[in-house]
């Protein structure tokens, strides 16, 4: 469970009414509005209150949902005293990585690539996402990992060999990934050209010299309707996943991704994968 914070809307009506309401609220601010919102079999609390210079009025802090410390605030607002950010940057990054991995696998499954051609490269310089190995190895017979810390991957690689009979190949050189059908780019290394191989990337912007796929759009209809205004989408979904136990979030695929200047769908990416053996560039 977590809490979201946003501002109450400014007074409505004519000029005189707004001035009167504003003066009255300064003398005796209205209490925060607290609403329990049910979503995806769980719930969170949405709090609307008056803020000044991005901070909640001190008189209201004592009336807020004591004991519920994890919170998200709308952009430009500071969390009230006693509350902490509901999710960490690392947790948000993990969800993004999961969505990218799920989307890559969905595209491979929808493509006409035979199983023996499903060779995938995982770029993870700092070894932050070894847990993705099992997802990848279930659908890809060959997984190459480009990392500077292969020793951290060793326990995961050993388990993949024991449970699936699949050896994991490690490299510290990006060009070694050149024969892959698709790449999962979870680092910030400068990439050489892998055209026309789709590169599913955590980066904020596409890499011009690659068939770079970034900014996945994902979601659950029920959750999309429940996101309060101003709340960061990735943080909200991470909180649903990590704090509310909505497991469906961890299995989400992107409905579209940004490729150069336009959005492309999973079927379009799958078609590119299918045609890459003939060097046909569908996503151009």
What are these regions (language model features)?
Residues 88-106:
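A glycine-rich, Thr/Ser-enriched phosphate-binding loop motif common to dinucleotide/cofactor-binding enzymes
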Residues 5-9, 50-53, 74-78, 122-126, ...:
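Structural motif
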Residues 30-35, 52-56, 62, 157-178, ...:
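A short, well-structured beta->alpha microelement
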Residues 79-84, 129-131, 150-157, 190-192, ...:
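Short, charged/polar "capping" segments at the starts of alpha-helices
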Residues 166-226:
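Rossmann-like adenosine-cofactor binding region
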Residues 200-284:
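Adenosine-phosphate binding glycine-rich loop
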Residues 6-18, 25-83, 105, 277-284:
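Metallocofactor- and cofactor-centric catalytic cores in central/energy metabolism, strongly enriched
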Residues 110-175:
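Glycine-rich phosphate/diphosphate-binding loop of Rossmann-like nucleotide-binding domains
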């Amino acid at each position: 469970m977590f809490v979201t914070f946003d501002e109450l809307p400014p007074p409505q009506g004519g000029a005189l009414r707004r001035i009167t309401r504003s003066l009255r609220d300064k003398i005796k601010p209205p209490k925060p509005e607290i609403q329990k919102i049910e979503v995806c079999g769980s719930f969170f609390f949405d709090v609307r209150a008056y803020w000044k210079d991005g901070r909640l009025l001190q008189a209201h802090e004592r009336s807020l949902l004591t004991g519920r410390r994890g919170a998200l605030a709308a952009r430009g607002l500071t969390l009230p005293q006693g509350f902490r950010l509901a999710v960490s940057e690392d947790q948000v990054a993990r969800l993004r990585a999961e969505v990218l991995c799920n989307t890559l696998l969905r595209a491979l499954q929808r493509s006409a690539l035979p199983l023996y051609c499903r060779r995938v490269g995982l770029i993870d310089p700092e070894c932050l996402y070894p847990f993705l190995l099992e997802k990848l190895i279930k659908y890809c017979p060959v997984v190459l990992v480009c990392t500077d810390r292969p020793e951290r991957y060793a326990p995961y690689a050993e388990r993949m060999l024991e449970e699936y009979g699949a050896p994991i190949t490690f490299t510290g050189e990006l060009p070694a990934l050149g024969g892959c059908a698709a790449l999962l780019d979870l680092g910030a290394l400068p990439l050489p050209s892998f055209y026309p191989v789709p590169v599913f990337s955590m980066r904020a912007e596409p890499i011009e010299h690659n068939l770079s796929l970034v900014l996945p759009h994902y979601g659950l209809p029920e959750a999309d309707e429940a996101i309060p205004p101003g709340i960061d989408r990735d943080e909200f979904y991470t909180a649903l996943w990590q704090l509310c136990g909505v497991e469906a979030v961890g299995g989400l695929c992107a409905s579209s991704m940004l490729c150069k200047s336009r959005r492309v769908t999973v079927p379009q990416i799958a078609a590119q994968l299918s045609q890459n053996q003939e060097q046909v560039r569908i996503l151009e």
